[in-house]
């Protein structure tokens, strides 16, 4: 309702994806299609959910007919004037994010405003929010920072130019950080408008399926309420992000991506420690391990269902020919500090700027070339 209430002069298509729901969502979509000629929807029948990583792209490519689209969450209330701000700031090769006004569900940050006008639709204080927001608009209409997060508005052509979200992360988690990196590498400028906002309520879905709770004092708490499904998928997606980019998700205080260089790294593991194999495999292009053929195949068999990357090409025997441009050799001794060095390797290599061989803790590092490959990741 908030989109229709507050869209102003703009003609807005609302495009919704139903991901194998069993709660009557599709019946509601059909009702809305009959009532609203600009309400459109697609249904994924399942039985397994494919997630918004896949369905956002189908909405953009198959359903939306406008040149400008916006990734928008169902738990957001569109504030008055938000679309005017997007119209004013969106230009070729830009993405505009609306500022989130949030109840205290998540850690505060400089890129959002924390104000509690309700955590669930049933307790939403709409009139109070709109009255408070008049002063915000008055003082922040021209304020803008760099950063990107939902909801974000973009030109469809810029989205399609990099082939949208990477299915590596399906059904969800880290797909947004991945596409933001790729947008930035492809020359997109990010703008966060503070005069255009949404109110963002409880994150309903796979992460907090049961919503938020308040204690007797009225304070909101979300800690330890994540579902097992979300925790498992988030771990898988994090490992896949590291496999692809060679580092954890990084951004500045306003959530603008920080993208270290991607190098061609091979790890040479001269022992039969399968736990170390599991920990180190995502942090390189190739790992040459001393475990026997049976243990190596066992690792591949167990881990392969968690990624679409071919692990048989990443996990190789210790004596295999080593063609990586950077080799990190590990013998029997390996500490948490050494693991930290591997996690920081892109920054260490960028700062060293030299080819050659050197020791770092218990690591022997051979640098044959410092070619970088992050721009090869722009298109998925």
Model segments located where?
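Short, acidic, metal-binding catalytic loop of nucleotide-sugar glycosyltransferases
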Residues: 2-11, 279-286
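A conserved acidic beta->alpha catalytic loop
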Residues: 18-27, 291-297
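Acidic donor-binding/catalytic loop of UDP-sugar-dependent glycosyltransferases
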Residues: 24, 74-89, 332-346
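Glycine-rich, basic loop-to-helix element that forms the pyrophosphate-binding segment
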Residues: 45-64
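Conserved donor NDP-sugar-binding/catalytic core segment of glycosyltransferases
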Residues: 46, 77, 81-121
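Short beta-strand-to-loop acidic/aromatic patch adjacent to the donor-nucleotide binding site
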Residues: 66-77, 323-333
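A recurrent flexible, glycine/aromatic-enriched loop bordering the glycosyltransferase active site
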Residues: 132-156
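A short, conserved alpha-helix in the catalytic core of glycosyltransferases
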Residues: 147, 151-152, 158-163, 169-197, ...
């Amino acid at each position: 309702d908030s989109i229709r209430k507050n869209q102003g002069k703009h003609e807005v298509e609302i495009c919704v994806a139903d991901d194998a729901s069993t709660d009557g969502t599709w019946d509601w979509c059909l009702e809305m299609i009959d009532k609203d000629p600009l309400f459109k929807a697609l249904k994924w029948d399942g039985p397994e959910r494919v997630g918004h990583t896949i369905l956002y792209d189908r909405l953009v490519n198959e359903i939306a007919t406008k040149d400008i689209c916006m990734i928008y969450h169902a738990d957001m209330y569109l504030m008055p004037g938000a679309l005017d701000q997007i119209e004013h700031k969106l230009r070729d090769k830009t993405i505009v994010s609306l500022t989130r006004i949030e109840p205290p569900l998540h850690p505060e940050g400089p890129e959002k405003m924390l104000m509690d006008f309700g955590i669930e639709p049933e307790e939403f204080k709409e009139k109070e929010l709109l009255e408070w927001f008049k002063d915000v608009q008055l003082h922040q209409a021209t304020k803008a920072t760099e950063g990107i997060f939902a909801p974000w508005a973009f030109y469809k052509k810029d989205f399609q130019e990099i082939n949208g979200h990477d299915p590596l992360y399906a059904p969800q988690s880290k797909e947004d950080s991945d596409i933001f990196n790729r947008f930035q590498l492809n020359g997109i400028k990010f703008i966060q408008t503070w005069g255009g906002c949404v109110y963002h309520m409880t994150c309903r879905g796979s992460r907090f399926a049961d919503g938020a709770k308040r204690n007797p004092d009225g304070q909101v708490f979300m800690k330890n309420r994540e579902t097992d499904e979300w925790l498992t998928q988030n771990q898988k997606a994090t490992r896949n992000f590291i496999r692809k980019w060679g580092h954890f998700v990084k951004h500045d205080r306003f959530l603008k991506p920080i993208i270290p260089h991607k190098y061609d790294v091979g790890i040479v593991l001269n022992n039969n420690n399968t736990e170390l194999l599991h920990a180190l495999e995502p942090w390189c292009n190739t790992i040459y391990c001393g475990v026997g053929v049976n243990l190596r195949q066992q690792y591949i068999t167990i881990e392969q269902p968690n990624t679409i990357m071919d692990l048989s090409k990443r996990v190789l025997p210790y004596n295999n020919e080593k063609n990586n441009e950077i080799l990190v050799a590990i013998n029997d001794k390996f500490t948490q500090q050494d693991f930290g060095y591997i996690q920081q390797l892109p920054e260490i290599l960028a700062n060293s700027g030299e080819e050659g061989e050197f020791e770092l803790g218990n690591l022997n590092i051979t640098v044959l070339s410092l070619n970088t490959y992050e721009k090869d990741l722009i298109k998925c």
